[in-house]
């Protein structure tokens, strides 16, 4: 027998009361986005399950994709069949025969939500267990911790049989906690911050600053590839490329070297906040980790934050670098992040950046700039691209390989 579908059990969203169906529908949409590369798949949801019908598709890549989607508590490959006792008997016998090995223990666990069905749960357990003994007389039944628990569900629309339960990613469906702008440089930290924001249901749009010719097409492709990795956890992500060359040249020419990083980050924060307001986001997310680099001391954060009253979420702020690296490896972004392309935070980086910049000094140096004009021109020049889980071709990978 081949699996008919993957049955998805919902996570934290099961506690969301009146908003339950909104959460479930969002999870369904996210699953559809993530499974877009598999056109035969169909998805439907009810109040306590989402059903992913395979329609002949190999189940293993579908399971691997679903394991990453936030809002999924657990999933099981299942056999779906008509609610017929003879069909159930045959299916249970076939499944257990295929699983049998010497010394195997099992139990039947039946759940009946269709109370019009001819047998109750206890009767089904007895009947189906007896059917297994008919074809496997040496198998042993065991009620506590058996090797195989064969779950049989009798629901209104059909019967379902499964024996495997696979842990999901947990968390909340992406998009159920509002929208935020992720400042993604291309380094190790910001993709991890994005992953953790997605886990709490935040719908992120990626803001990436590009300064050609100082930053290369490879750096841009790298940031887009990192964004594509993040789509595996909740579906499509808008990638916003911000032209930043003019601003960085202005800062380089007019500001003291020690304040280059502080002023650069202040402009990035202003621009991200303007984009957030334009695109109706609620928060800004970044990959700052306290004390890791000069711009991430408390004094630096205070001087940079002063340009906005928008909440700033820093998911990795208390994590050690090794912890961040381990998480980056676990979510498969690390190998991309360490590709050697310059980004806007590393070009023009001073040898001795100010670790305790004074807000008053930063504001005084910024009097040399047309701040509103620079920000407005950057925001008006953004390029928005929708990044999807589906890779139509290997253009991004080929570009990066060619440039390395």
UniProtKB/Swiss-Prot annotation:
SMART domains: THUMP. One of its GO terms (cellular component) is cytosol. Pathway: Cofactor biosynthesis; thiamine diphosphate biosynthesis. It is an enzyme of class 2 (transferase). InterPro entries: Rossmann-like_a/b/a_fold, ThiI_AANH, ThiI_fer, ThiI_N, THUMP_dom, THUMP_ThiI, tRNA_STrfase, tRNA_sulfurtransferase_ThiI. Its EC number is 2.8.1.4. This is Probable tRNA sulfurtransferase.
């Amino acid at each position: 027998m081949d699996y008919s579908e993957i049955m998805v059990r919902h996570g934290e969203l099961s506690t969301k009361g009146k908003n339950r169906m909104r959460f479930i529908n969002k999870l369904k949409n996210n699953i559809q986005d993530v499974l877009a590369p598999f056109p035969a798949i169909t998805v439907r949801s009810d109040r306590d399950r989402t059903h992913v019908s395979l329609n002949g598709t190999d189940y293993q890549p579908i399971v691997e994709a679903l394991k990453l989607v936030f809002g999924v508590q657990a999933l099981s490959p299942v056999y779906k069949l008509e609610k017929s006792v003879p069909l159930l008997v045959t299916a249970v016998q076939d499944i257990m025969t295929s699983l049998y090995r010497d010394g195997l223990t099992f139990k039947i666990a039946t759940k009946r939500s269709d109370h019009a069905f001819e047998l109750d749960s206890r009767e089904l357990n007895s009947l189906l267990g007896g059917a297994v003994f008919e074809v496997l007389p040496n198998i042993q039944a065991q009620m506590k911790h058996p090797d195989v628990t064969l779950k049989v569900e009798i629901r209104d629309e059909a019967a379902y049989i499964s024996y495997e339960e696979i842990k999901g990613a947990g968390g909340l469906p992406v998009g159920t906690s509002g929208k935020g702008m992720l400042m993604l440089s291309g380094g190790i930290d910001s993709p991890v911050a994005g992953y953790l924001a997605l886990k709490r249901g935040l719908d992120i749009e990626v803001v990436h600053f590009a300064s050609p010719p100082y930053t290369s097409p490879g750096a841009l492709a790298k940031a887009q590839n990192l964004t594509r990795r993040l789509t595996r956890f909740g579906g499509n992500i808008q990638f916003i490329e911000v032209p930043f060359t003019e601003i960085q040249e202005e800062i380089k020419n007019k500001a003291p070297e020690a304040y280059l990083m502080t002023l650069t980050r202040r402009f990035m924060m202003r621009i991200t906040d303007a984009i957030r307001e334009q695109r109706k986001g609620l928060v800004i997310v970044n990959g700052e980790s306290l004390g890791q680099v000069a711009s991430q001391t408390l004094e630096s954060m205070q001087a940079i934050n002063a340009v906005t009253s928008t909440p700033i979420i820093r998911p990795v702020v208390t994590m050690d670098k090794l912890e961040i690296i381990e998480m980056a490896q676990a979510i498969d972004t690390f190998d991309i992040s360490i590709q050697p392309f310059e980004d806007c935070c590393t070009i023009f980086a001073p040898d001795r950046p100010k670790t305790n910049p004074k807000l008053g000094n930063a504001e005084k140096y910024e009097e040399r700039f047309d701040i509103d004009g620079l920000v407005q021109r950057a925001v008006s020049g953004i390029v928005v691209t929708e990044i999807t889980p589906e890779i139509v071709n290997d253009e991004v990978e080929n570009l990066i390989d060619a440039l390395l």
